[in-house]
Amino acid sequence: MRRLGHHRLHGKTGGVGTKGMVAKLSIGVIVLLICTLSLLFSANIGSNREPTRPSKINVEELWESAKSGGWRPSSAPRSDWPPPTKETNGYLRVRCNGGLNQQRSAICNAVLAARIMNATLVLPELDANSFWHDDSGFQGIYDVEHFIETLKYDVKIVGKIPDVHKNGKTKKIKAFQIRPPRDAPIEWYLTTALKAMREHSAIYLTPFSHRLAEEIDNPEYQRLRCRVNYHALRFKPHIMKLSESIVDKLRSQGHFMSIHLRFEMDMLAFAGCFDIFNPEEQKILRKYRKENFADKRLIYNERRAIGKCPLTPEEVGLILRAMRFDNSTRIYLAAGELFGGEQFMKPFRTLFPRLDNHSSVDPSEELSATSQGLIGSAVDYMVCLLSDIFMPTYDGPSNFANNLLGHRLYYGFRTTIRPDRKALAPIFIAREKGKRAGFEEAVRRVMLKTNFGGPHKRVSPESFYTNSWPECFCQMNPKKSSDKCPPNNVIEILDSRLESIRDPDSTSQTNSTVTGLER
């Protein structure tokens, strides 16, 4: 009997639901809708033209998703995609370092690396986060069974490397440790890594953040990344439940916007933006930077002028006001502890008093106990994913914002507001020097040049995880054959191929691996 998670890939739908419908759905149903939309293609679509930029900012339109231009999410294979072979070349272990979303992209890369090498992937290890001191691990954050089941057409996955039983003796396989180069090309995995795997039966790649090149000239490999990121990586039920509780309460009062307010100590120290703080606070930031980042000459005025400083809370408020959002706008803040305290939040709160975070929306003990660390970040991620509008205030090296931008694009071109900090910097600097005439009009001109969530070409340095168009999207009536949606029976095709290589006796075998290795 097939599992529920597998059936979610089969459900029929009449197309992308209206905004009102989405507002009434629970997170579980919405996730189901996301999966269904990307693998089935029975909806009506509009024109194949990409949407043009608006001539003015219409706040009411921003509460709706951007025009799709006839594109829809699709990470299903479109060419010959054989299932994992019965025998693989060995086991692949990886240690994913960084925060929740840096680890998330590393997991996507690990699955792809396993596919490239025809390896059995050992459930990825999540590094105990150095900032949150969180050691929840993969099993504590993600739905393991769903992860394995969803990727059964792509790679074999086990919980740990099994022991070898031979001649009545048990032998443990020790993985050979390798430090992969940053942004390693596919060739490195097919030569250096694969050679070591065949020699030692298992390899351990550590650290594994940004260890596989993002730009790969193979659309099927890129679509596998999307299958991992947007389908296989599902948070555990209790995290989804906490997120659902918050979203339901926010939606009960209408539209809401989420903002990733990146004004925390680690980001400010990384950016080298110290001068707006008092001497004691600057001392704290300099100490943190010295302990955690490479030594570099950083001058605040120069950094700010080129858009390298995170927006302050007040600047965020001024941008929204210039765009003509009013003070009744409900805003959910996804942020850790803001550095500098209330003195920086007060101007923002004056402009937009309806500010919330996960603790203020749902002050339950259960949520309070998990509000910090990776679980708290996971809850923030889900709320931001499902919000009507998402605004990152610093989407440079911020993996949280980058992943969310890509996920919301895949989710149906949901509206995002991405301030161009470099273009806005001289406007804010002039305002601070007393030049306030024409300030809001100048901000609006900058914001009109940004993309609010529709399909757009990925241009370096934009990350694949921020924008997976066009590889992970398709059209029913495309101009190019490579953009054509796969057939409706793609799952049945993959199923039949998988069944053809299965060992009929595998279901009776047991070992120390995660149940589901041979599903």
UniProtKB/Swiss-Prot annotation:
Its main location: Golgi. Its EC number is 2.4.1.-. Residues 46-519 are lumenal. It comes from the Eukaryota. GO terms for biological process: fucose metabolic process. Pathway: Glycan metabolism. Glycans are attached at N118, N327, N357, N511. Residues 1-24 are cytoplasmic. One of its GO terms (molecular function) is glycosyltransferase activity. Keywords: Carbohydrate metabolism, Fucose metabolism, Glycoprotein, Glycosyltransferase, Golgi apparatus, Membrane, Signal-anchor, Transferase, Transmembrane, Transmembrane helix. It is found in: Golgi apparatus membrane. Residues 67-86, 497-519 are annotated as: Disordered. Residues 506-519 have a biased composition (Polar residues). The chain crosses the membrane at residues 25-45. CDD domains: O-FucT_plant. InterPro entries: FucosylTrfase_pln, GDP-Fuc_O-FucTrfase. GO terms for cellular component: endosome; Golgi apparatus; Golgi membrane; Golgi trans cisterna; trans-Golgi network. It is a single-pass type II membrane protein. It is an enzyme of class 2 (transferase). This is O-fucosyltransferase 1. It comes from Arabidopsis thaliana (Mouse-ear cress).
